[in-house]
Regions:
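A short, charged, and often flexible helix/loop element on the N-terminal side
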Residues: 36-62, 109-115
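Acidic anion/phosphate-binding donor-loop and adjacent secondary structure
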Residues: 162-178
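Short N-terminal targeting/anchoring amphipathic segment
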Residues: 5, 60-78, 83
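Membrane-proximal helix-turn-helix segments that form the acceptor-binding/catalytic region
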Residues: 61, 113-136
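Acceptor-binding helix/loop patch of EC 2.4 sugar-transfer enzymes
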Residues: 41-45, 92-124
Length: 184
């Protein structure tokens, strides 16, 4: 049986979920590598102005060393944009309504000229990632419908974001004398 290798690039806040997902895929025989996307690829626009001047693109080295069959991104930024320049299939995991978020950002906190430039560039990068992706993986049916309305010919598959409660809560069994659903 052929083994596939998957490279996952994600944001710091999603590392936990990507690592957990990677462990499940490895249990199924897939080879996975999870990286912080900005460690390998960053530049204009970025919240850190220093990244505008000192661009980072270590992604070609990572790709040549790891040789992934697929790349999954959990946000639409430089990492995904650089993957679109390769022949490697790009899977985009969509966790929110990207277009509504951009629209609201433009109306609220990104009104100044420098911030307008940044948000417009983020929008262009996002659109390029979506357009060039092999498949878009929204986390719910609502988002799948949003994507279908924007990209009628794009492969879209809902990938539900399951949450394992054992990661946050200690679960101790309860000893019930008379278990019931409710009082009759």
């Amino acid at each position: 049986m052929e083994t596939f290798s998957l490279l996952m690039g994600g944001s710091p806040s999603k590392m936990f979920h990507l690592k957990e997902f990677s462990e499940k895929l490895e249990d199924l025989g897939m080879e996975c590598k999870v990286v912080l996307d900005v460690d390998y690829c960053d530049g204009f626009p970025s919240r850190k102005i220093s990244k505008w001047v000192f661009k980072k693109n270590k992604l070609p080295n990572l790709i040549s060393e790891y040789k992934p069959d697929l790349v999954l991104v959990d946000r639409q930024r430089h990492f995904g944009l650089e993957v679109t320049k390769t022949r490697i299939p790009l899977l985009v995991h969509l966790r929110g309504d990207f277009w509504k978020e951009i629209e609201m950002a433009k109306k609220t906190i990104y009104k100044s000229i420098p911030k307008k430039i940044v948000i417009n560039e983020w929008e262009k990068i996002g659109e390029k990632c979506f357009q060039e992706s092999t498949i878009i993986l929204p986390i719910c049916n609502y988002l799948s419908n949003v994507v279908k309305n924007r990209y009628q010919n794009k492969k879209i598959q809902t990938m539900y974001q399951g949450i394992n409660p054992e990661n946050w809560f200690e679960t101790k069994g309860m000893k019930l004398k008379h278990p019931c659903v409710g009082i009759l």
